[in-house]
Amino acid sequence: MGQPVVVDSNIIIKEMQEGRSLHPIAKRIKKHKSKMVIPESVLGEVQKVTGNEADVIMDTIYEYCKYPVTMDKTDEINAESDRLVEQYYKCHYPDSLILATAKITGSALVSFDRELLQTAKLEGVQAFLPRNFVRWW
């Protein structure tokens, strides 16, 4: 099995609003026999922005990925998130939780947020813009 991949909320939001962003990522994950990881904080953020309930959001994800892994916050993820907020001036909640989830689970991270991607790289987490993930991962 390949490396898991954490998908940021901005990918799912863009998919729900415009389409086209999640499908190529899901195809790449499937090709590598990997898992798409959806942190609890991502679901919350997507709900807040789109106004959709969690089941509607998950239905959108299920269209392209049959078995995503939803990840609850753990004490370890919360502690890592707090450390990231303290260490990096530009790393805020909920981005810190998303990055902490990727780091603790050994996952790659896909996001449109360049500051989050930069912080991820400083933390040793593989991080990609969607187009680069589809092209190079």
Functional labels for PLM-detected ranges:
Residues 1-38, 49-59:
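Short, well-structured N-terminal submotif of metal-dependent ribonuclease cores
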Residues 1-7, 104-137:
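Acidic, PIN/NYN-like endoribonuclease modules and their adjacent C-terminal/linker elements
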Residues 32, 64-65, 123:
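Short, structured coil segments at secondary-structure junctions
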Residues 45, 73-79, 132-137:
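A short acidic, often aromatic-flanked loop/helix-cap motif at beta-alpha or helix-coil junctions
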Residues 55-61, 67-74:
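Helix-adjacent hinge/juxtasegments
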